[in-house]
Amino acid sequence: MFSHIIVGAAHGSTLYVGDMLFYAILFIVLMALIAKFAWGPVNAMLKERADRISNDIDSAEQSRIEAEKLAKQRKEALDNSHAEATSIINNAKDSGAKERELIIGNAQNEAKSLKDKAKQDIEQERADALKSAQDDIASLSIEIASKVIKKELDENSQKDLIDSYIEGLGDSK
């Protein structure tokens, strides 16, 4: 069909108007058929593809937003866990310091109590030793006095006499 056009163009001959008219009508009919039967489905396919691409883009955007939201939540959870861990550590340190102070205070109180009890025991032992020494001195003095003055005093009178003498010595110091 086109061969005579090509051959004619090569030989320098002119185109036939009838052929051109035929080709123009054929082109218009072909375009009408394409518009009637193929253009709708092709257009629908292109619209469907554009919608699918748009939906994919929207879905990807939504997924990106959700991923950012999850990342933000995880970061907040991580920050909260770091803050909570820091709080727990600080509370443990404070609790340990308070416990240490309590233990030290109790140990100091117990040491003071033991020291006071030891002082009381020492004072009691000293008083007992002093009383025992006074009794021994009184007995010894009675023996010496009875030998010196060669007379016997009853034991209570002698003790009173010696105690008053010892107290007099204690006051003079």
From Swiss-Prot:
Assembly mode: F-type ATPases have 2 components, F(1) - the catalytic core - and F(0) - the membrane proton channel. F(1) has five subunits: alpha(3), beta(3), gamma(1), delta(1), epsilon(1). F(0) has three main subunits: a(1), b(2) and c(10-14). The alpha and beta chains form an alternating ring which encloses part of the gamma chain. F(1) is attached to F(0) by a central stalk formed by the gamma and epsilon chains, while a peripheral stalk is formed by the delta and b chains.
Keywords: ATP synthesis, Cell membrane, CF(0), Hydrogen ion transport, Ion transport, Membrane, Transmembrane, Transmembrane helix, Transport
GO molecular function ontology, one term from the record: proton-transporting ATP synthase activity, rotational mechanism
Cellular component aspect of the GO annotation: plasma membrane; proton-transporting ATP synthase complex
Keyword Transmembrane tagged: yes
Topology with respect to the bilayer: Single-pass membrane protein
Keyword Kinase in record: no
TM spans (from-to): 15-35
Pfam families associated with the record: ATP-synt_B (PF00430)
Alphabetical list of HAMAP family matching this protein: ATP_synth_b_bprime
Main location: membrane
Protein name: ATP synthase subunit b
Cellular localisation: Cell membrane
Role summary: F(1)F(0) ATP synthase produces ATP from ADP in the presence of a proton or sodium gradient. F-type ATPases consist of two structural domains, F(1) containing the extramembraneous catalytic core and F(0) containing the membrane proton channel, linked together by a central stalk and a peripheral stalk. During catalysis, ATP synthesis in the catalytic domain of F(1) is coupled via a rotary mechanism of the central stalk subunits to proton translocation.
UniProt xrefs under CDD domains: ATP-synt_Fo_b
InterPro entries: ATP_synth_B-like_membr_sf, ATP_synth_b/b'su_bac/chlpt, ATP_synth_F0_bsu_bac, ATP_synthase_B_chain
